[in-house]
UniProtKB/Swiss-Prot annotation:
The protein's name: ATP synthase subunit delta
UniProt lineage: Bacteria, Pseudomonadati, Pseudomonadota, Betaproteobacteria, Nitrosomonadales
Name of the gene: atpH
Superkingdom to which the source organism belongs: Bacteria
Record's subcellular location: Cell inner membrane
Organism expressing this protein natively: Thiobacillus denitrificans (strain ATCC 25259 / T1)
Stated role: F(1)F(0) ATP synthase produces ATP from ADP in the presence of a proton or sodium gradient. F-type ATPases consist of two structural domains, F(1) containing the extramembraneous catalytic core and F(0) containing the membrane proton channel, linked together by a central stalk and a peripheral stalk. During catalysis, ATP synthesis in the catalytic domain of F(1) is coupled via a rotary mechanism of the central stalk subunits to proton translocation. This protein is part of the stalk that links CF(0) to CF(1). It either transmits conformational changes from CF(0) to CF(1) or is implicated in proton conduction.
Length: 178
């Protein structure tokens, strides 16, 4: 995962700088997210991985599927990624772009993963606590993972707050072993 992160970083930073220069962070966010969704499709992923399909054909297909909203600079971005065999990095590029965008906007991105579905009131309480702790606005994505058994794990910035039963059990097992 860190290799993908390392490879994607210069592309994410380049797109971010371009978006800032154009004063269009929201537009580029939408474009990069769309491209990440397209390359995540199983059929497109197979085409990208097929050495018999020329890189320029794959780029043309992706630009075509993305539509007019991509624009000339977006199409050029796809062509650069394709020529450098980096199309598969688009989901990670999108993630890093969103992190850079949130930083520029003064917000933090957080993912709350709980063992069970959270009510809106519970999510609002967690967001209020995170805002108070970090003194910044927080954008939240919520996910459910029954393997946590109970509680929740919050990933915000480069921090992880593990309040799950699974995490507590793992920490107890580690303490008993050491």
């Amino acid at each position: 995962m860190s290799e993908l992160s390392t490879l994607a970083r210069p592309y994410a930073e380049a797109v971010f700088r371009m978006a800032q220069d154009e004063n269009d962070l929201a537009g580029w966010s939408s474009r990069v997210t769309t491209l990440a969704t397209i390359v995540s499709d199983t059929q497109v992923a197979r085409l990208i991985a097929d050495p018999a399909v020329p890189a320029d054909r794959v780029a043309e297909l992706i630009v075509s599927v993305a539509g007019d909203g991509l624009g000339e600079r977006g199409a050029n971005f796809v062509k650069v990624l394709s020529a450098n065999d980096r199309l598969t990095l688009l989901p990670e590029i999108s993630t890093q772009f969103e992190t850079l965008k949130a930083g520029a906007e003064g917000t933090l991105e957080a993912t709350i993963t709980s063992a069970q579905e959270l009510s809106q009131a519970q999510v609002d309480d967690l967001v209020a606590g995170l805002k108070a702790k970090f003194q910044r606005a927080v954008n939240v994505q919520v996910a459910v993972d029954p393997e946590l058994i109970g509680g929740a794990v919050i990933m915000i910035g480069d921090q992880v707050i593990d309040g799950s039963v699974k995490g507590r059990l793992q920490r107890m097992a580690f303490a008993l072993q050491g």
